[in-house]
Amino acid sequence: MSAVNTPAGFSDFKVADISLADWGRKEVIIAESEMPALMGLRRKYQAEQPLKGAKIIGCIHMTIQTAVLIETLVALGAEVRWSSCNIFSTQDQAAAAIAAAGIPVFAWKGETEQEYEWCIEQTILKDGQPWDANMVLDDGGDLTEILHKKYPAMLEKIHGVTEETTTGVHRLLDMLAKGELKVPAINVNDSVTKSKNDNKYGCRHSLNDAIKRGTDHLLSGKQALVIGYGDVGKGSAQSLRQEGMIVKVTEVDPICAMQACMDGFEVVSPFKDGINTGTEAGINKDLLGRIDLIVTTTGNVNVCDANMLKALKKRAVVCNIGHFDNEIDTAFMRKHWAWEEVKPQVHKIHRTGAGTFDPQNDDYLILLAEGRLVNLGNATGHPSRIMDGSFANQVLAQIFLFEQKFAELPAAKKAERLTVEVLPKKLDEEVALEMVRGFGGVVTQLTPQQAEYIGVTVEGPFKPDAYRY
């Protein structure tokens, strides 16, 4: 048994192994040195305690970097209760370190779907009763949806939601359009210092790492198909290209497709003439029969469907770095094909039928992380320096919404404030400046004459909201 001690009498947590806390703490200390923006905000605002009185329910990947985020929120005055937004993404040593610090956390790597939902419930409840939470920090929207559907009374005290991902933002906007969203939300995903860092540069770093850890394959000289060319797709295509892969891209958006062409990628379709007829006859079998690796990056459903999976080259690697496991039709694979676990989060999917299989069969696909996020299932996700920008945005977004005190507004004012919006650009620039300083960079200041000439202040913001970085 470990010598690790939690605060006396503290048992408000469930992790895989509390004895991993010392290891986790060592990694947290290293991560802090690689997160200058987040730590800069901690130093800047700690005396002010801008989150004093905030009670935050958090549901985001329980990694080492998230531990730094959690402890920053606490340092600024908040109370938190935490779970992971993915059954495979928790780093158990990180969860243990947070529990050992006396912070309620419910997360471990390899949760079942039922355990995943149970963990979220434990953050919503305290001592079996709904916690008097007033803020939500979410990744993907599951926590937000559960609160709206099962605990609507809690929303009367909640000032708002800060959402990390494209998928979660889509769900928020859908709820807003249908009149179902009851609290305002900050779209952290579309802050420049999140979308460009996390979605693009983070995936560039972590996709190839995860594939190599999962398969031990040499990637160079092989053919890859990247589904989607948004920021995640751009980073993913670069990640595979720098490994020496021959990368093709498929897109539905002509602007993103044009960008892929300009970046030197061949834009193709897995469907004849680009039209998904829903039949095997409509599949571009010549293309898919040559693909060694396929990765989904879209946040959309069934972008790698059953007919595509049937047509893929034998022994092709299939993975997802978008968000949920429904980007790949894993439901079809579970129903019709046999699964053989090679090691945790690596399966051979035998296309010879369900039930028993011949271990020597060579007609299989290699599925990573069961179709969930490959970079967190098969590796440790984005590095600390990447997550620095994302999580600094989360802190500023939490402060921003908490100060607005939505739950205390009269009904008429609430109707005006019920929006899904991005952080003000000035705050985005604040995060970027701290990141540049962390790299040892020096930003040049405009002269008053230059600022007047382009119609901005010397302190910024420097670009209009519509500017595309």
UniProtKB/Swiss-Prot annotation:
HAMAP family: AdoHcyase. InterPro entries: Adenosylhomocyst_ase-like_sf, Adenosylhomocysteinase-like, Ado_hCys_hydrolase_NAD-bd, NAD(P)-bd_dom_sf, S-Ado-L-homoCys_hydrolase_CS. Belongs to the adenosylhomocysteinase family. Substrate binds at T63, D139, E164, K194, D198. Its cofactor is NAD(+). CDD domains: SAHH. Gene3D superfamilies: Adenosylhomocysteinase-like, NAD(P)-binding Rossmann-like Domain. This is Adenosylhomocysteinase. Binds 1 NAD(+) per subunit. The gene is ahcY. The keyword Cytoplasm applies. NCBIfam families: ahcY, PRK05476.2-3. The keyword Hydrolase applies. It catalyses: S-adenosyl-L-homocysteine + H2O = L-homocysteine + adenosine. It comes from the Bacteria.
